Structure formats: C-alpha cells, structure tokens
Amino acid sequence: MRGLQPAHRHLPDYRIILVAFRGRPASGTGHVAAELGAHRGDHTQDVVGAAARSLPGVKRRRGVRRGDAEFQRRFDVSRTVAREVAKSLETAKVVTVRRRIGLVSQPVEEWDALSTQVIHWKLHSTHRKEQLRALTELRLAIEPAAAISAARYAPIDVKSRLPLLAAEFRHTGENGRLDEFHKLDIEFHSLILRNSGNEMLASLSTIIATVLSGRVELHMYPQKPKPEALDAHDAVAQAIWQSSPNNARQAMHRIVDEVAETLQLS
C-alpha cells in the first residue's frame, strides 16, 4: 500500500493533516498521545478515535487514501486491530472503501452525525463549539417533547422516581459531590427519554448521555450548579409526577436554555 495521497491534486489549498501516519502532528490536531488519551474505551476504540479526529475530513475535504498497513505502522497495532479500526471508521461514514484504492476519507459533514462515537470525536476536536451548538439545538427539539410524553405515558413507578432523583440531584450538587451529581443528571434525562412512550425519542437517550458525559470530560460544567438549573429539574420531575405535560415541557425548556446560556451558545 502506498503512502497517503490526495485524491484531488488540483486543490492547491488541500493539506494532509496526518502526514503519512508517521507521527508528526499537524497544526491544530495535537499529539497522538493526547488524542489517544482523550477517548475512553479499549485500545481499538482509542485508535479509532485518534484516527478519526486526525483525518483530513475534519478540514472538510475528501480524498486521502490509506489502508490497514498504514494504521498498523502509525499506531503500532496488529493487523486485526487495524482492520477493526478501518471497519469502525467505515461504519461511522468517516471513510469509504474503494476497490483498488483502499480507504478514502470523507468530509466531516458526511460523517454519521447521530453516532455516539462521532459525537465524542467532534467534542474533542476543533469542531467542539459547533458540535455543542448542534447538540443543544437537538436537545431543545427532543427533550421538551420527551417531557410531555413522559407526563402522559410514563409508568407510575418512573413518575414517582423522578422527584426523588431530582432531590438527590440537588443534594449532591449543593454539597459539591460532583461525580455523583453528573451521574444523576445523565440518569434523570435518560429516564425521561426512555419512558416517553416514543421509541424514536427513547433511542436518542444514548446520544444525550454522550453529550452530558462529554461536557464533564471537557470540564464544561460549572463547579457550583446554578440554583435555577436545580429548580428546573425539580419542576420537570414534579410536572411529570403530576401528569402535567405543559408544565413538564416548559420546565425542560428552561433546563436546556440554561445549558445554552452556560455554554455561551445563545
């Protein structure tokens, strides 16, 4: 397999971000060690994440060719791992496979936007702010709707659990137990989505969990939770418990609006 080659030689401004996979970090991509450390998971997924975040697709260009052997050399992994990396990148639409050419990188806008892997990679790249904006807009679209549906259709045991969860959420936040606080936040939002009575909304719970955990990893939560955020979680829980769809929608909207304000996206 030959080294990396631009498929569009006529583009003078085209730059290969990962130079021949020989370990020289390009501007804006960071060192490989930092890239590997950014993704939590087994070694194969570490390599997948590092490879994806350093592809020329991040620069919105298409066309760098590479193969398994290059992944082996670049990341010092076995052929089996290299093939798994290539397959994962193809599944996420980060690359396409072309006969007699190999793997060809794709522009970032063609990646699988709803893949939790892709979301994670973008959050740890130079696309962080636009990814956070897109995800916050997604949350504004789906979470108030999920709160409405949960108020109508969630089982009684789930409805009764939410006020207790919100109280625990407040207690851990006010007492600085942030690790527990963040876990409860993920549980709270996931529980509402999964019990909305809408399988489409339920399927997005893993995406919202990825968003919330990503904010923790990136240190984008305030060290002291805002009282209005705690109040809004209480209000959502009470509205769903009382089967009040409109109040649930309004309170959930306040939660996501507060997130946008905190992240300076609004």
Could you describe each region identified by the protein language model?
Residues 111-114, 120, 126-127, 138-157, ...:
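Hydrophobic, amphipathic alpha-helical faces that serve as interaction scaffolds
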Residues 11-14, 39, 166, 170, ...:
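C-terminal all-alpha effector/ligand-binding and dimerization domain
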Residues 45, 129, 140, 160-163, ...:
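Amphipathic alpha-helical repeat elements characteristic of tetratricopeptide repeat
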Residues 6:
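Cationic, low-complexity basic patches in intrinsically disordered or flexible, solvent-exposed regions
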Residues 9-16, 20, 30-141, 148:
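Short linear motifs at protein or domain termini
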